[in-house]
């Protein structure tokens, strides 16, 4: 998972996508922001769905999607059409992560409304319902995306987000959580699904990662991570040599996590993508 708002150029995206395919990774997900979180207006950002559509034409097997597209950016018909277009270009490899939006400074900078969280949650539910209708039954919305893109909703498993996910989504994605927190959050999602009389959602995790093939490589990457992040002393939940990171991922698997999206903050470090591919083979 790449933070596209942190100055990731088209050349970077091409290199990252090629590395993901070569390394054997399942997918390449990106954030959907217009303003840098770390550097404010000093870093550029390409539009998420334009980027995904372009990458869909340049890749062969990678899953592509957002974590997550804010409902405050686009009307639901525009978002549904953008995703459906990318789905056709990709031959069925696109997934939509969608959320209520949180980055107030970004909304102010670009002129988006940023209502209170309750209103944003109302809009999330409205857009989920509208997108499902546009993709499935609305007679005016053609072509229908086939297969239907998976819908991902996530957060920290608070009641309202879980209810929305259970009504409309295929997957619940929690973020930056320990294995113990994942176990608790999965239990809440599963309980809500049972109460609604539906099958369990796929339960996934998005969290940061810094890995190295040995401790020297790892130390270099940790130093670079802290420089990019601007927070000395901070390390992500999945940090270590390949063997150490594999052991950590097995802890998440034991806690009920079925899929992991590892956040890669240093988009110029393409070699770490290959290291993540080696890590994936260790735990497959």
Predicted feature locations:
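Active-site-adjacent structural elements that line small-molecule/cofactor binding pockets in enzymes
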Residues: 1-284
